[in-house]
Amino acid sequence: WVRARGHDSYWRFHRDQFLTLVPPPGKLTLDVGCGEGRLPRDLKRLGHRVIGVDSSSTLIEAARRADPGGDYHCASATKLPLESASCDLVIAFMTLQDVDELAAAISEMGRVLVASGTACIAIVHPLNSAGKFENESADSSFVIAASYLDEFGYTDDIERNGLRMVFHSKHRPLEAYSRALEASGFIIDAIREHRIPEEGFRSGRSRRWQRIPLFLHVRAVSRRSLDTTRIVSRS
């Protein structure tokens, strides 16, 4: 699925939208939940020194095959194999909606970041995961039948062009992510809710997603960097 270039939203629009939030290359970039490594490879082409981490040994092996010179490790998002304050950028692209321990994963992201570090996050938009369209028409109503404010697991089984992918994820309200970031010393710097661009449409039914965001992008900075700035300015 992810290795079929042009097959999913990553290739058609999602990567380019997300990269507008990512700062320029610095000391070290960590991709948490790197999968088979397509984002680390793109980041390397942009000049980033990247380490990729994923809990799936199968995906890590695929990443190593696709990028023999890359730095990939099989590890949990809640126990990252890096020293504290070793990265200046941590990316979690379409990862955090799939982890069971959200607070622990974000805490680990904060631990490995330097004081001036940045976290860039992409998730399934909580509005998207809470509900669904009633039908495939472009003007279909979008209905939230359950509670947006409750956390629950869900499964998406999708087949397209002969390729099948089963996603097992968790719906969480936006506040759950905000609170986890706050508890780990982050301040949200930017939030983006992109529409699908015209060139991203695969079919007429895709136009439904011009009214409801598919994804949520968040950039957060370490509160410690702000505290340091205040200390320097007073000295």
Where are these regions (language model features)?
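A short glycine-rich, Lys/Arg-flanked "PGG" loop and its adjoining helix->strand segment in the class I
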Residues: 103-115
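Short alpha-helix
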Residues: 168-191
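A short SAM/SAH-binding and catalytic strip from SAM-dependent methyltransferases
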Residues: 89-102
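Conserved class I S-adenosyl-L-methionine
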Residues: 1-25, 38-42, 59-62, 118-155
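A short acidic, Gly/Pro-enriched loop at the edge of an enzyme's catalytic core
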Residues: 78-89
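Acceptor-substrate binding/catalytic loop of class I
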Residues: 127-130, 162-175
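Class I SAM-dependent methyltransferase SAM/SAH-binding core
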Residues: 30-32, 36-79
